[in-house]
Amino acid sequence: MVMNNKKKLVILGGGVGSMAAAWQLTSQPNWQDIYDSITVYQMGWRLGGKGASGRGDHARIQEHGLHIWLGFYDNAFDVMQNAYPMLDRPPGSPLATWTDAFKKHSYIVIAQNYNGKWYPWSFDFPENSSVPGYGAITPTLWQYILRLIDFFIKHFRDTGMKLYVERAIESDEHQSAIARLNHFVETKLAGLEIGAKTLAQNLLLVIETYVKNLSERASGPTEDDHQQIIWLLKELHASIERHLKEKINFDLEIYRFVVVMDLAVTIAIGLLRDRVLFRPDKLDSLDQEDFREWLARHEAFDETVSCDLLRGFYDLVFAYHNGDTDRPSFAAGTAIRCLFRILFSYKGAIFWKMQAGMGDTVFAPLYLALKKRGVGFKFFHRVQRLGLSADKKSIKTICIARQATVNGEEYDPFVRVNDLDCWPATPNYCQLQEGQALQDQNIDLESFYTTWKDVEEITLQSETDFDDVVFGISLASVPYLCRELLTDPKWQAMANKVETTRTMAFQV
């Protein structure tokens, strides 16, 4: 008798985390030597989690929010670049390749409230020849700071010079700043000729030269170097404040320039002043403080801390306690890491726009590719709770409610729209024994609050039905589905302290 030592793996939930896990596990050349089966249990009729989409009346795309991918999503694009060829779609057919499904999008507009009126604040980010998913090398924190400094120097030269006008009769403080800069050049950059330019022009040249010299040094910058950079940046910041700050409430262009410069310069000053590069946990060391509070601590202007640019950034990740916009909460280190990745690590374009719903462009291809690899899918299976073993060290049982009965052996989840496999906005009722009742009662099988009576409860047993478990359901479900795990202090801390935000979407 041949013993089968292969394991059974169950994946709970069909969102992006679960699909990424299924893809990675089945990307190993010998995965079928390890696992006898991999099965995904998903409530309702489709995959996607928050990224799900469906085709409603007249095949209109319905989804929870407008989804885009950022240009630094190397892992996600790598998956798509490998999944799409497995679909064998004919050339010229809808979404035949990943480049058909994702297009560069570089023009971004934020609504800005300025002096009681709304204005579009537009950004047209330059594109580059890099391809997301290839050559994924993340810059070091020091390299990011260098890119940040390079950015605001270029921004000042391109935008600020026409706005920055030094007064004909300068203040004593201005003259003192010139003297301090001349002394710095004499002692730190001997031989550099700064000439008869404005103070701002000279400051930009000195910062650029000093930082370039540091970047070429094999040993990297010292703490003293950081202090010198801080001094230079504070001189630049003070010059902007002297000559432009008082004008921001009367000139929209000046307001925008000052806010962008203040934000960039303050981030650089704050990172160096907090000695983040010398801390073992780097940016994580700042995560006990809200990003806006961190900026204020490092003397950013009030107008910058409250600007619509930051509001849009917080909105992007729903960074508010319980969704309350009066209680912003974005961990400073995480926020800075996000900004750096978004602005200085993108490939091709800052955003890539899906050419259909996220379900059509991401989760339908993943479903089809994973099925080809041998992954099983059980739709209409809602996880109810996980039970632990007697020693509390492993999962013993998984209780699952079957929501509906499929006619035949397997549920076909798609509808065809212009020769493209798409998820419908409601189940394919004709494939379900309870389909008519679900339709008549307008039941939403994806709702946490559904009143629908489940068909039956199934209990999966470890070592019989599964050996390994991937829990891919939203973190917010843990207190409801994994109560026994919460006796562990680490699980309890995660459930209590890592917040999620409820969101609502609508279409008109």
For the regions a protein language model found, what residue spans apply to each?
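Beta1/beta-strand and adjacent pyrophosphate-binding region of the FAD-binding site
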Residues: 3-17, 39
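Short hydrophobic core segments
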Residues: 10-12, 41, 383, 462-478
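Glycine-rich FAD pyrophosphate-binding loop
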Residues: 26-55
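Dinucleotide-binding Rossmann-like beta1-alpha1 core, especially the glycine-rich loop
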Residues: 57-183, 205, 220-246
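Active-site/ligand-binding neighborhood in enzyme catalytic cores
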Residues: 154-457, 461
